[in-house]
Amino acid sequence: MPLRIIFMGTPEFSVPTLAALVEAGHEIAAVYTQPPRPGGRRGLDLQKSPVHQAAELLGVPVLTPVNFKDAADRQAFRDFNADVAVVVAYGLLLPEEILSGTRYGCYNGHASLLPRWRGAAPIQRAIMAGDRETGMMVMKMDKGLDTGPVALTKTVPIGETMTAGELHDKLMHAGAALMKEAMVKLELGELPLTPQPQEGVLYAAKISKDETRIDFTKPAADVHNHIRGLAPFPGAWFELETAGRTERIKVLGSEPAAGAGAPGTILDDALTIACGDGAVRPTRLQRAGGKPLATPDFLRGSPIAAGTRIC
């Protein structure tokens, strides 16, 4: 029989999983998502999350508690009498009363190979660390931060030039298929649970503004991983002095390149940039207020001479 599911998620990453559960014939009793946030050009309009919008199209009740500190919100969750809660990038901590508030508990779709990269930014951190693979896991949630037993795993390779945005999309769809499979096995009583290893724990801290600036004194491999791990958002950047003013330029893609020089020096007309060891060549750039451009197109409008130092 189909399961009665409470779905909990917020960003675009969560939407394919919700759609997959509906397609599989499960009953979505309710959708929980974060409250609408100020948005629009002036930040005056309240914008609903991608999951909120998807749920409304499905005609499913949507709840947007700020947290679960209010007893009425916790009771409302239990009153749905759901078989299971499916959680994908919800963004709120769940108290034990919620974790145990359905027949089978809460199952989370997490974008890493746990216990590596527990926490808020597993996709970015995996690329920034130079990992060659990552994956999606379905785990049963407990009171710890991504510490629960693992049910299913799908490994996904990370290409040498793959950006966080590209990996996000691969994992988003892999996660939807994996959760769909997990719910079938849960229905049949055949969903295995394996405790996470005690070794290899790493935490994927939220990306801070302070770490988005590119440090060209680092080895080229680290700079390349930094750039692609932050692309397209929030975007790694450098500053360039032009016509007596400082301009910030985002680098949304790069490739390793041959070359050597003082870190931050432009080595040729293709914008190869010297690093602490080796060099990188940006492949996609964006200036403030502009649209992303392939580097040759960017340089056609704004050439940067070899020998220029960037900071």
From Swiss-Prot:
Reaction(s) catalysed by this chain's protein: L-methionyl-tRNA(fMet) + (6R)-10-formyltetrahydrofolate = N-formyl-L-methionyl-tRNA(fMet) + (6S)-5,6,7,8-tetrahydrofolate + H(+)
EC code: 2.1.2.9
GO cellular component terms, A-Z: cytosol
UniProtKB keywords: Protein biosynthesis, Transferase
Cystine crosslinks: none
Keyword Transferase attributed: yes
Protein biosynthesis recorded as keyword: yes
Single GO MF descriptor: methionyl-tRNA formyltransferase activity
InterPro entries in the cross-refs: Fmt, Formyl_trans_C, Formyl_transf_N, Formyl_transf_N_sf, Formyl_transferase-like_C_sf, GART_AS, Met-tRNA-FMT_C, Met-tRNA-FMT_N
Sites where the protein binds (6S)-5,6,7,8-tetrahydrofolate: 112-115
Enzyme's top EC category: transferase
Source domain of life: Bacteria
Family: Belongs to the Fmt family.
Function of the protein: Attaches a formyl group to the free amino group of methionyl-tRNA(fMet). The formyl group appears to play a dual role in the initiator identity of N-formylmethionyl-tRNA by promoting its recognition by IF2 and preventing the misappropriation of this tRNA by the elongation apparatus.
Xref: PANTHER family: METHIONYL-TRNA FORMYLTRANSFERASE, METHIONYL-TRNA FORMYLTRANSFERASE, MITOCHONDRIAL
Protein name: Methionyl-tRNA formyltransferase
Species whose genome carries this gene: Sinorhizobium fredii (strain NBRC 101917 / NGR234)
Gene (name only): fmt
